[in-house]
């Protein structure tokens, strides 16, 4: 069967739902597809709750993690939407998922207000650089008291302001995902209002299309008879089929190959552009030669490194960080783009220890090379838990 060609007529934006478990992230995602399907049936297939809920599964640390990718269109834009799992255990995936967002819909149940995972997701969104947030105050049909709704809204705004989002100015839309899903016209209207807020408050991202191509690899699989496919979100540049690429990072040696095909949502593309989630077919590359954490680049435009200087913020105990200080030769994992690599920390002269809540500079030596450049962001993690966030300030080797 010939693959349908992807029409690139509208601007493309990556968004996702974040928030506490059971506040209605998946229901809202399903409701968005239903309401948009009812408005523009020719543009949007409806994705029922069950279909999103049984998202493709990924295993991490023995926990089964699912992340659903849904696509839909408003009149203005084409969206790729990730429904992030809500569990605190799934934060690893949130880091990979949230890293793919130009903006997020923070779902908060009006019946509960902000909960621990709400805070955690907002903190994480800030760390991984989700630039814009729109709030869906869900289950608003279940709260009759206007004052209570206003109070919850205020709480959410304060939480966002505390994490350096413009809490006073960003849109908070009262919705009922369930009622909209059941076809209630009033609540369907509220959902359209939410999507208008997303259209207007999450700016068209400045794409990095002018820069040389780079895509971090998230997943690798084999397609029988066609070869090895790597998937991920193109970070910058443009790649066309039959162009040469280089695979850099994790391994000692970089590999050169040719990209023989590009696809998105099972449709063939004539190019991969910065900001898009794509699959790249690589010629003559074995599955075992590629792994998550490598990057696909325009040959010669990025180099693997193991030693760097960085400026970091270590989370306080209240933010879910360490309870105790760390010392010279601390060995956590450094999470770059899509993967964790262990590294050894050297503290600056005169610094004996770093307390939770501190800002510091450090020198890090990784046990595996990572394609890096100055200003690249990373998370510092221990056993899957984020304990700090940083940026590369200088590459040593």
Curated annotation (Swiss-Prot):
Keywords per UniProt: Cytoplasm, Elongation factor, GTP-binding, Hydrolase, Magnesium, Metal-binding, Nucleotide-binding, Protein biosynthesis
Region (G3): 83-86
Pfam families linked to this entry: GTP_EFTU, GTP_EFTU_D2, GTP_EFTU_D3
Region called G4, residue ranges: 138-141
Record region (G2): 62-66
EC identifiers of the protein: 3.6.5.3
Limits of the tr-type G domain: 10-206
Region (G1) location: 19-26
Binding site for Mg(2+): 26
Region listing for G5, in residue ranges: 176-178
One GO CC term, this protein: cytosol
Localization terms from the record: Cytoplasm
Catalytic reaction equation(s): GTP + H2O = GDP + phosphate + H(+)
Annotated GTP binding sites: 19-26, 83-87, 138-141
Gene3D superfamilies: P-loop containing nucleotide triphosphate hydrolases (3.40.50.300), Translation factors (2.40.30.10)
Molecular function per GO: GTP binding; GTPase activity; translation elongation factor activity
Function, as annotated: GTP hydrolase that promotes the GTP-dependent binding of aminoacyl-tRNA to the A-site of ribosomes during protein biosynthesis.
NCBIfam families in the cross-refs: EF-Tu (TIGR00485), PRK00049.1 (NF000766), PRK12735.1 (NF009372), PRK12736.1 (NF009373), small_GTP (TIGR00231)
SUBUNIT field: Monomer.
PANTHER family listed in its UniProt record: ELONGATION FACTOR TU, MITOCHONDRIAL (PTHR43721:SF22), ELONGATION FACTOR TU-RELATED (PTHR43721)
Family statement: Belongs to the TRAFAC class translation factor GTPase superfamily. Classic translation factor GTPase family. EF-Tu/EF-1A subfamily.
Name of the molecule in the record: Elongation factor Tu
């Amino acid at each position: 069967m010939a693959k349908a060609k992807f029409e690139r007529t509208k601007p493309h934006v990556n968004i996702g739902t974040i928030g506490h478990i059971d506040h209605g992230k998946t229901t809202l995602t399903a409701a968005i597809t239903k309401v948009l399907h009812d408005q523009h049936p020719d543009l949007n297939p409806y994705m029922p709750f069950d279909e999103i809920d049984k998202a493709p599964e990924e295993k991490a640390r023995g926990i089964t993690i699912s992340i659903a990718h849904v696509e839909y269109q408003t009149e203005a834009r084409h969206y790729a939407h990730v429904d992030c799992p809500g569990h605190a255990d799934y934060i690893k995936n949130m880091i990979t998922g949230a890293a793919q967002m130009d903006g997020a819909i923070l779902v908060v149940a009006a019946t509960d207000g902000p909960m621990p995972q709400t805070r955690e997701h907002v903190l994480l969104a800030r760390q991984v650089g989700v630039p814009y947030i729109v709030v869906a105050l869900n289950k608003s049909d279940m709260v009759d008291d206007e004052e209570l709704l206003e109070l919850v809204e205020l709480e959410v705004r304060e939480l966002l302001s505390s994490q350096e989002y413009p809490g006073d100015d960003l849109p908070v839309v009262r919705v009922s995902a369930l009622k909209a899903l059941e076809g209630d016209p009033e609540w369907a209207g509220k959902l359209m209002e939410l999507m208008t807020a997303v259209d207007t408050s999450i700016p068209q991202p400045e794409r990095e299309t002018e820069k040389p191509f780079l895509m971090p690899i998230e997943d690798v699989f084999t397609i029988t008879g066609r070869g090895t496919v790597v998937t991920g979100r193109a970070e910058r540049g443009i790649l066309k089929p039959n162009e040469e690429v280089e695979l850099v990072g994790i391994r000692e040696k970089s590999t050169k190959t040719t990209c023989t095909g590009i696809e998105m949502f099972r449709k063939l593309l004539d190019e991969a552009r910065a900001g898009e989630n794509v699959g790249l077919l690589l010629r003559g590359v074995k599955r075992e030669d590629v792994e998550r954490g490598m990057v696909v680049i325009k040959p010669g435009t990025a180099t693997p490194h193991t030693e760097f200087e960085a400026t970091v913020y270590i989370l306080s105990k209240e933010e879910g960080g360490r309870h105790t200080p760390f010392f010279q030769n601390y060995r956590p994992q450094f999470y770059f783009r899509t993967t964790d690599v262990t590294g050894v920390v050297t503290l600056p002269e005169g610094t004996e220890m770093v307390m939770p809540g501190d800002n510091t500079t450090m020198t890090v030596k990784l046990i595996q090379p990572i394609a890096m450049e100055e200003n690249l962001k990373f998370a510092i993690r221990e056993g899957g838990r984020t304990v700090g966030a940083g940026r590369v300030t200088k590459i040593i080797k």
